[in-house]
Amino acid sequence: MATTIQNNFRIRRNFGKINKIAEIPNLIAIQKFSYDKFLQADVPPEKRDDTGLQGVFKSVFPIKDFNETSSLEFVSYHLEKPKYDVDECHQRGMTYSAPIKVVVRLVVWDKDEETGAQSIRDVKEQEVYFGEIPLMTENGTFIINGTERVVVSQLHRSPGAFFDHDKGKSHSSGKLLYNARIIPYRGSWIDFEFDHKDILYVRIDRRRKLPATVLLRALGATPDTAKKDPVEFHGSAEEILKYYYDTETIRVEGKGKFEKDLVPDLLKGQRATRDIRDPKSSEVIVKKNRKYTESAIKKLVAAKMKSLPVEPEEVYTKISAEDVVDETTGEVLLEVNEEVTEAKVEELRKRNINEFKVLFIDNLNILPALRDTLMQDKISTPEEAIMEIYRRLRPGDPPTPETATNLFVNLFFNAERYDLSKVGRLKLNYKFGIEEPLENTVLTKRDILEVVRFLIDLKNGKPNKDVDDIDHLGNRRVRAVGELLENQYRIGLVRMERAIKERMSLQEIETLMPHDLINAKPVTAVIKEFFGSSQLSQFMDQTNPLSEVTHKRRLSALGPGGLTRERAGFEVRDVHSTHYGRICPIETPEGPNIGLIASLSTYARVNEYGFVETPYRKVEKGRVTDEVTFYSALEEEKHIIAQANAPVDKKGNFTEAKVWCRKEGEYIYVRPDEVDLMDVSPNQLVSVAASLVPFLENDDANRALMGSNMQRQAVPLLRTQAPLVGTGIEAIVARDSGVTTVAKRDGVVQSVDASRIVVKADVPTSATDVANEVDIYNLIKYQRSNQNTCINQKPIVKPGERVRKGDVIADGPATEMGELALGQNVVVAFMPWQGYNFEDSILLSERLIKEDVFTSVHIEEFECVARDTKLGKEEITRDIPNVGEEALKDLDESGIIRIGAEVKPGDILVGKITPKGETQLSPEEKLLRAIFGEKAGDVRDSSLRVPPGVSGTVINAKVFSRKGVEKDERAKAIEEMEEAKLLKDQNDEIRIIQDSAFQKIRRLLLGKEVTARLVDDKGEQLLKKGDVLDDALLDTVPQRYWGEIAVAGDVQDLARKIIDNFEEQKELVKLLFGEKIGRLKKGDELPPGVIKMVKVYVAIKRKLAVGDKMAGRHGNKGVVSRVLPEEDLPYLEDGTPVDIVLNPLGVPSRMNVGQILETHLGWAARNVGLRLQEMIEKEYGPEQLRKKLRAAFAGTEGGPASDRLAALIDDVPEKELPKLAQKLRRGMHVATPVFDGAREDEMKALMEEGSATLQSILFDGRTGEPFDQDVTVGVMYMLKLHHLVDEKIHARSIGPYSLVTQQPLGGKAQFGGQRLGEMEVWAMEAYGAAYSLQEFLTVKSDDVVGRTRMYEAIVKGENTLESGLPESFNVLIKELQSLALDVELLETPEAQAAREAAERDLGGGPLGAPRGAVASGEKSSA
């Protein structure tokens, strides 16, 4: 079994006990899936769903003109092929995008004046270019202007209805005031709120509030726009009250005698106002002033009582539920919502009306809030209500009934203006238990009525009604790339729609074609702006593969339509119980964004509505099945969920009598038969970065957060090493990140070199088919990443090896053997050493630097642009004025540095000269110019030089020239090289297809008898009739004649068919490569005014140095404080010096014990490797090796992973065993999954296998004496982080100054100075260093006059220093004067004279800025 010692596959001993049920979904699927759904590029136009781009077009089109005599309709769209591929876009600084073409139809109508009927006069259909749309690369990124960017998914509040209260903060009484808000996806918000008097108000779009009943009445006046509306509602007071209150019928039995119908539901909780007796037995069922209990109500029903007596005082406070009208006169005796009084009842009795309906309001469970609101409301008809709403929304506009109704209908019932989205509709249906179709995304009357009902129920304290938790993941949803872009596209199309409407009405529509109407500029501008400057379109973090993956899986609550850092409180940032398995509780930034930026958990995915789902295993009758289903936070609510590590036997039954479970965010202890679901895996709780931390369960959460964040900052090293102690997820991250090369099809490796791999794929084909069975993988060599780290791929397969689809065949940056490798395994000791590891400092061995263990390569890109200026063209050349030959030694004749040159700060990379402005010449100069020609004087050197702090090797140069500009020698050379590379690929591809085709013909011909003589072009015989073909004979015939060999049967026809197929494939390949070469040869698209652009790439080797930041995976970070020679470091008994000495005090208070466990397990794993190495050296037999390997890899306990490994080792052939053991010489790799890791007894067993100890005796390297106590020594995986001292060190001599204050700029990028702040001034004062202080505050900062004097003094050799006035003092005076305070500076005559003299020398006024000053805020190159 060859797989064990293949180079692209590593076996790890896995300590996990839990069998893997579900595979981790592709880590960047969220990006790809969302964008594919948006574009629907591979779906035929007629089959596309109305989502994404198709949905936007469908919602904005048709566009009609103002008179509705013509309309522009959308038919379909399609994407064309992108102009450049991904690599070309990278190199040329282009955007990777595809042109989009839209088919539109312009329909012109004729309108019949009398009947108003419309008939079609004219239809024109046309395909219109609609701008470009960026495409996503297969790694889930976008290339915008040559840089890779990621669009981060946004976590925002889901549309729907939300209920809340003010927590008693609004009113002094501390009363809870409830409110409700209907949030659409786009459109106006509706807010309902109670005030402290229990009156219900409504606000539309946060305007002034109205009584809520105004809105309810207005619903009655909406014309039948919502025909589908399920509720008949006309907005009368009676309807409103009956919708929200139950009614009781009161009958008048005589003066002061009343009774009411017995309604069991309304009696519960009421008090009896007198003894209630059974009519037959006269037994008292409910005593006076006692509550009606459930049993009492049952007795009343059993006694068949139809009505109950009512006391008069109870009746006299009731509220009438409807108008009571005298039918004879038509007079209203008792109005709806009027209080029933004794006088009113008497009036009714007189008129013989003995029955009326009242509202059931008991002031306990049912409060009169809505009735009180109606009383407050002065409006009586729906029409008035609509006018009132219009006045609120458009103050100062005189309303007419028509405009008012239009406005109201457009606000909530018009799909163009209001959109709940499917999600909003889903949420409303779920909340109120209604079954409105999801396609109806506008509000209905019922929605608004139900929101008010729910709010009133909340106020009344009805059971099972509760306020919403807005941090619940059922109320927050994810907007991924596709949806964000869809919204942008809609904005662009709406802008375009206005322009189209205007054009349709302005011009003669009959003569126009669709393309005359459409200008796609607004759409492309919006898209460009979104990708270029939106808060959610971010520069990809490309430090290492993990940072790429994490960036694509990030969820941000910030951005347009989201929160802002300042407004976000603690609740939003906090971990919520619904985050379990959906959002990682650990990985989030420290600082102001904590909790607002999160990461998706490992197994999480986003469903079609944008809610985050996590997988669970079904549990049936206490038995766990292997059926896996995804649940969103809302769907999971009612389930009881067991943990992934709950003990289960082989058949899936829980082994314990009770199981710890989660339900609705609480932790409960239940019987196995009550459990519904079970977690899929222990690491489904955390994100990718957190699940790469071994022994995460033993680390404090704060440190785990730092650990997972710092792994993203690890720099890819020159020599990669996968961790000895991993978690088993490393290979998945490396595969999904896209930095490795993955085989596309099964096949056999044909050839391998450093820059490409050729694989002959297994293509099942028919006898005559010649399919393209070649996969050529061109590897990325020394490319610069966004963070200036180096992207380089190296093959890990050999020719002749079989590869499977999905296998890693080439390692990328920070990967080794297809596994993520962010750092190095080093031997660490926990002990203090001479104070050099005080406060988290790190002491290093010189070996790490000598052997380049932590060396990384960084690539800087420098760009030089030759422009066409007003004074003439700039030129890139070797001929530079006033520069010695020494400085030009590495430039070629085109003025560009040669590849391989070593450069240091100040060296010329690209020679460039710029024309100078003409100056007034003296007569002598004119004469000299006339005699010697005038070349040298009129140009200045503006070459690109290496900036300070950069020294390295030039690894690449690229030249881009404008179309029509003659290419220089260097550009031609680069072009030829690229062309040769492409031709090589083409020829290889053709060669492999040819071999395969003639192999097929050979198989057909072998053993056949020739039926006719075969001659070549010259008439010489190649085969004679009757020859029997074998390999040797066939090889004598040139391949081009094989199709002409005559044999019996249809073999010759088949052979000819194969040759024809081969020729066809060959032409296809040539065409493909021809296109690429054509693109290479044509000129480049450069920005306006640019003639030529040169990019030079310099590779810098950064060794580990004092001041570099290093970290482990457990949040244990530190700075290198000293590099010690190997001989001075503490060493072990066998003489091995340790590599790193860490401070033991970094562990207890930080509570990240995981690092100690990792150290022990790493030590055990390393020692197992050493023991195997000894066994090979002592030539042990294969069976002993096998036994040792089995013990190390499979352990004694077994488990699904160990059993597989044991079987694997048993299958290894004897002669390959030493080879396998040899691969483990640096240590055996183990995996300890998060929350399911190695136990203490397993670690001890492995220690014994490698005869390692938990603590070792260490000897002092300087004296040879053993240290007093045993020391914890082991192997830890250490990372070098991106905070490198070489990139931070900076010094300034003379540089740019700020324009106003004349003080030096700040920061390395501006070549700025060091700030001397208030406290530093105090320190200097405390020392009494007056002259130094004066110098700091004047000439070294902003004393313009003093700076000049200082220069003069130095030139003249004088040692006196006279400081003048700091410029910022003048600024202060001017600012005071601007406040109308007349501040004047009084000068002594000497000072005045000195100042004037200096100003004369400077040639400026008091604010005359010297050369080199720049406006602050502008970046200036030093």
Curated annotation (Swiss-Prot):
Known catalytic reactions: RNA(n) + a ribonucleoside 5'-triphosphate = RNA(n+1) + diphosphate
Name of the protein: DNA-directed RNA polymerase subunit beta
Function summary: DNA-dependent RNA polymerase catalyzes the transcription of DNA into RNA using the four ribonucleoside triphosphates as substrates.
Database matches in SUPFAM superfamilies: beta and beta-prime subunits of DNA dependent RNA-polymerase
Quaternary data: The RNAP catalytic core consists of 2 alpha, 1 beta, 1 beta' and 1 omega subunit. When a sigma factor is associated with the core the holoenzyme is formed, which can initiate transcription.
Natural source organism: Anaeromyxobacter dehalogenans (strain 2CP-C)
Domain of life: Bacteria
Positions of disulphide bridges: none
